[in-house]
Structures are given as C-alpha cells and as structure tokens.
Regions:
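Conserved alpha-helical scaffold flanking the Walker A/P-loop in AAA+ ATPase domains
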Residues: 1-16, 48-49
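Basic, amphipathic alpha-helical bundle interface domains used for macromolecular binding and assembly
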Residues: 2-3, 25-188
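Thr-Gly-centered strand-to-loop micro-motif
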Residues: 18-19, 43
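Walker B catalytic acidic pair
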Residues: 13, 19-21, 31-32
Length: 188
C-alpha cells in the first residue's frame, strides 16, 4: 500500500515524546538521527519514494536502570546492567540531543502549587517562537526557532562570548563534546 506518515511526521512542528526510551530498540532510535538532522523522513516502498516533513523536538525519558529504584542505594542492578540498560541510546543519537537532564527522585516530584496551566505555557512558547522568527527574518534567515538556524551562520554572524567559546573549544579538544555538540550549544 501507500506509505503513510508515522509518529515522526505526525510530530512535525511539535514534540515527539518517547517514554522509557531505553526500552525502544536501538535501530528504531538510530532511525531518528536523519529526521532530527534533515527535518524530513524519506520512505521507499515498491519502487517509490515519499518524503514527509519531520521537524520536531525530541524529548525522551528513561530510567537509569531496569529496576528504576527511586533511591540509588536501593538499586538491584549491577554496574554492567546499568551501563547496558542505556546502551540503546547510541553516541550519534546522543550527539543530536540539545540537552540531557538527570533528575533525582526528589527533583522529579511535581509540586502542584504554583503550577502553570498548559495554555499559559503554550502562549509563552508561541510568543518566544514569534520573536525568534522575527529576529531571524530580520537577518534574512527563514527559521522559526534557533534550532533551525544554520550553524555556519551562527558561528559567523552571531558568535558566542569569547569565554564560552574557549570553554567549548577545550571540551572539543578533550573529546568531551563533538563539533555537532558545539553547534547545538550555540543554538541554545
């Protein structure tokens, strides 16, 4: 039959949330690399190729290990099991993630008091995107978000502070970050 858009294309201009990402097969996760980089997904079926838009923000959640113990001292997994549990998240995929945040059980607890309504947050996000689009439009760039701006343009026309570049260069030289990682930091 005719190829149909999947989750990646349906998340176009939005968020693709993968819960329990470490449980997703490695080839599936690695299949996200091209759409994250190129902003589209290409499907080839029966001597026919279809391209669907796929510019999305990827958000993944994963426990640090299979037992998911809230208190690390109560974890039943050995170090090898913990390392293997997150091995589905390949280096090249991690390299395409803008941020990686580790939450402790206490930090992950949601405090309902003072919590904002989703509609209020959505309005702030929409306003921020409008400001970003106007800023880039003034520079002749057709981008709605910082993530869509070509890295070469950012390095040339909107360089980061010298102290930040010195730090990023040191991380790059030590192999703690890749050039793609440096570009991602500049876009943040």
């Amino acid at each position: 039959g005719h190829p149909r858009p999947g989750a990646v294309s349906l998340a176009h201009n939005g968020v693709l949330f993968l819960d329990e990402a470490s449980e997703v097969a490695a080839p599936v996760l690695d299949g996200l690399r091209a759409p994250l980089e190129e902003g589209h997904v290409r499907l080839a079926r029966s001597r026919r190729e279809v391209t669907y838009p796929a510019r999305f923000q990827l958000v993944m959640a994963a426990n640090p290990c299979r037992c998911a113990a809230e208190d690390p001292s109560k974890c039943r997994c050995n170090p090898h099991e913990r390392m293997n549990y997150l091995s589905n998240l390949s280096g090249p995929l991690r390299d395409r993630l803008d941020m990686v945040v580790t939450l402790t059980g206490q930090a992950a607890t949601i405090n309902a008091e003072g919590e904002e309504e989703s509609a209020v947050i959505a309005e702030r996000v929409a306003a921020a995107r409008e400001r970003a689009a106007a800023r880039w439009w003034a520079d002749g760039i057709t981008a709605r978000t910082n993530g869509e701006v070509p890295s070469s343009y950012l390095r040339r026309k909107r360089p980061a502070a010298e102290a930040a570049m010195v730090m990023l260069s040191a991380y790059l030289a030590d192999g703690e970050i890749s050039q793609r990682g440096v570009d991602r930091v500049l876009k943040l």
